[in-house]
Regions:
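Short, small-residue-biased leader/transition segments that mark boundaries at the very start
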Residues: 1-7, 232-235
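Internal alpha/beta core interface subdomains
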Residues: 3-4, 8-109, 113, 120
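Short acidic, glycine/serine/threonine-rich loops at helix termini
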Residues: 9-15, 43-45, 131-135, 140-142, ...
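Gly/Ser/Thr-rich active-site loops/lids in small-molecule metabolic enzymes
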Residues: 52-59, 135-165
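Acidic catalytic cores of enzymes that act on phosphate-bearing nucleotides/polynucleotides
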Residues: 99-145, 154
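A glycine- and small/hydrophobic-rich beta-loop-beta segment
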Residues: 150-227, 231
């Protein structure tokens, strides 16, 4: 676990839920797990990182600032319930001890493995069209789930990414709102959903389903790949 990784907290989740509810019909369809607000803190340079857990005075100062700031937003802007500083602090004192054996300098650990000619695999999640810069903005995630994200996320140079493999479903899916030109709002879509067990891994929501969009595949391949694999749906 990288020491520089930002921590997602209960106030991120509370803000995510409040912000999404306030948008009405303009909802993006987030998982409401606080990912966006956590990334916002990172960009605003007020995020709390794993390494802060091991300097408790620094952690307490950062947590106090964040709780005060987030509670103002929750109560004054969104008319929502505030979060409790003491409860969060008590939780993270326990988390710090439990996580300590797993915290390391992942950048150097990965680079060391590469230089020792060990096999290193970076596995991405989500999809190209959810990329913050290259996806269907604003209906995107907060990070970069493309090949370049492996380099920046792991902290190794792009020259170390020797082979980039892409996996494409034989049909298209989407969770949440956003454009979906080939979506099938009919029996075909239902069959694809049933056949592929297409339900969100976090929310359990039924995924939107439709035909494979080769223009999207071409676009994604240009952004990412040296090899592509199309998965074949099979019946249970």
């Amino acid at each position: 676990m990288g020491s520089e990784m930002c921590i997602r907290d209960s106030y991120h989740i509370a803000l995510d839920m409040a912000e999404e509810a306030s948008k009405g019909d303009a909802k993006i369809g987030t998982t409401k797990n606080g990912i966006g607000p956590c990334y916002a803190d990172k960009v605003n340079r007020i995020g709390i990182r794993i390494c802060d857990l091991y300097d408790m005075e620094t952690f307490k100062q950062k947590l106090a600032y964040n709780v005060e700031f987030k509670n103002k937003m929750l109560t004054k802007v969104y008319d929502a319930e505030p979060v409790n500083y003491d409860e969060i602090l008590a939780d993270y004192i326990k988390y710090a001890e439990a996580l300590k054996p797993y915290v390391t300098d992942t950048n150097n650990a990965v680079l060391k493995a590469i230089k020792e000619d060990k096999k290193v695999l970076f596995e991405g999640a989500q999809a190209t069209m959810l990329d913050l810069d290259h996806g269907t903005y604003p209906f995107v995630t907060s990070s970069h789930p493309i090949a370049g994200g492996a380099s920046t996320g792991a902290g190794v140079g792009p020259n170390y990414l020797k082979n980039i493999f892409g996996v494409v479903k034989a049909y298209a899916t989407r969770v949440g709102a956003g454009p979906f030109p080939t979506e099938q709002l009919n029996e075909i879509g239902e069959e694809l959903r049933t056949l592929g067990h297409e339900f969100g891994t976090v929310t359990g929501r039924p995924r939107r389903t439709g035909w494979l969009d080769l223009m999207v595949v071409k676009y994604a391949a240009g952004l990412n790949l040296s090899l592509i694999h199309i998965s074949e749906p099979t019946r249970p």
